[in-house]
Structures are given as structure tokens and as C-alpha cells.
UniProtKB/Swiss-Prot annotation:
Residues where Phosphoserine is found: S181
Quaternary structure (record): Binds DNA as a homodimer and as a heterodimer. Can form stable heterodimers with CEBPA, CEBPB and CEBPD. Interacts with GATA1 and SPI1. Interacts with SMARCD2.
Region named Leucine-zipper: 246-267
InterPro entries for this protein: bZIP (IPR004827), bZIP_sf (IPR046347), C/EBP (IPR031106), C/EBP_chordates (IPR016468)
Gene name per UniProt: Cebpe
Lineage: Eukaryota, Metazoa, Chordata, Craniata, Vertebrata
Family: Belongs to the bZIP family. C/EBP subfamily.
Function recorded in the entry: Transcriptional activator. C/EBP are DNA-binding proteins that recognize two different motifs: the CCAAT homology common to many promoters and the enhanced core homology common to many enhancers. Required for the promyelocyte-myelocyte transition in myeloid differentiation.
GO molecular function terms listed in the Swiss-Prot or TrEMBL record: DNA binding; DNA-binding transcription activator activity, RNA polymerase II-specific; identical protein binding; protein-containing complex binding; RNA polymerase II cis-regulatory region sequence-specific DNA binding
Organism for this UniProt entry: Mus musculus
Full protein name: CCAAT/enhancer-binding protein epsilon
Residue intervals of the bZIP domain: 204-267
Protein modification: Phosphorylated.
Main location as per UniProt: nucleus
Amino acid sequence: MSHGTYYECEPRGGQQPLEFSGGRAGPGELGDMCEHEASIDLSAYIESGEEQLLSDLFAMKPTPEARSLKGPGAPSFPHYLPADPRPFAYPSHTFGPDRKALGPGIYSNPGSYDPRAVAVKEEPRGPEGNRGTSRGSYNPLQYQVAHCGQTAVHLPPTLAAPGQPLRVLKAPVAAAAPPCSPLLKAPSPAGPSHKGKKAVNKDSLEYRLRRERNNIAVRKSRDKAKRRIMETQQKVLEYMAENERLRNRVDQLTQELDTLRNLFRQIPEAASLIKGVGGCS
């Protein structure tokens, strides 16, 4: 492939030829660098009329109508649309999902475009703006609290102001939403014995009478238990005495039996009678 088809443009007026610090590379070095490249001649697309067109574009000045739409420090742009002669009233809320606040006829007529009517959301600056944004943003914890607990969080439809706190309202337990987790179950109501219980003032007569009745009942139960214990101990003592008396009786009868046997052994007739009675029996 030939590498000699390079073109040099004629230097324009007021331009200095570029000079490189290094020496110009030889044909051999250029051939090594651009081995697989092709050069395109662009001189056919460049004419003298193009330079005049560019100079006319840069020399164009903005119209007085365009200047009226800009401030004193704004850059000059000649392609502004004419301003809307109708008076524009700024709405109180021009950002967020509520776009109807801008008015129904803003976008109906394409020729009545006013750059001031476009609502631009500004990012908060400083720590106060960050706190306001964080309050107005969606928080999954608030959703969980509103659906799983007895607390209802009411958020305003618009973004909350930096100094405006959120309102937290306590809802009754009966009207609260059912718990979404088995760990967050509502406490079961008390039994029927606790339903009729009411708070009584300790200085009232009813409270004193109730305490006195309770004390009397406690004393009666304690006395009854003591009586049962004493009765049991008395019965134990009685049984022990009866047992001792029976043992003494048994010993006495045993001694009498031994005495009678000795007497009958000393008398021979009595001994024969005893033997005869023993044989007949």
C-alpha cells in the first residue's frame, strides 16, 4: 500500500506553521507507524464559503426581544421564543407529583412557553436541608410501625419543611392493625376475674373494709391450721399412751399365766387333770 498520498493545506492568514521540537520522522519511520492506515483527502469539502459562513454566525448579535428575557449577567442566546403577554401567577406548590397546580393552559399552547414556568427542584444545602429531605423521604421503618404496631404515622402529601416535625398519633389497641409477625402478637386480654376489678383509693372506706376482711380471713385460716396441727399432735400422744397401756397389759397377763403354770406343776392331781384335759382335747 502506498504511503506517499499525504496532502498539505495552504496556511491561512494569521496562522503560524506548527513546529515540533523533535525532528521530522523519515519515510521509513512513518511507514512503520502507519502501516495499515489510509489517508483521505478533505480538501474537496473545504471551501472559502465555509469560512465566511462561520464568521457570519459568530458575528451575529442577539435581537432586543431576546435581551428582554435575560438578566444583566446572563449570556446572549439569539434563539429565545417571545415571552407570553399573559400575567403568570406562581403557584404555592410547583414540584412533586401534583403537576395540576401549574394551570391547565400552560402546555396547551406551544407558542406561549415561558422558561419561568418550568419548576426546577433544588437540592438542599447544609445539614438542615438534609434533615428535611430525610424526613420527607420514604422510610420502611415508618411503614412497619404503621402496620405492625399500635402507632399510626401521618405524613403530609408534600415534602416536610426542615423545621416541621412529623405527627405521631397513638391509636387504641382495639383499633390497631393485626400484627404481621407472630413475635409481635398483641397481649391477650385478662380473664373474667380481672374484668370487674377497678382502681380504689387507699384512703377510702371501701378499701379499708376490704383490707380488714382480708386480714380477718387470713387470721382465721392461720388459726384453723394451728388447731389442726394441735389436734394431730394430741391424737398422736393419745395413740402412744394407748399403745403403752396395751403393752403393760400384755406383760401383766403373761406373768399371770406363768404363775398359774407353776402352781399346777406343784400339785400332782392337778397335773394329771391337766394331762387328761390335754389328752381329751
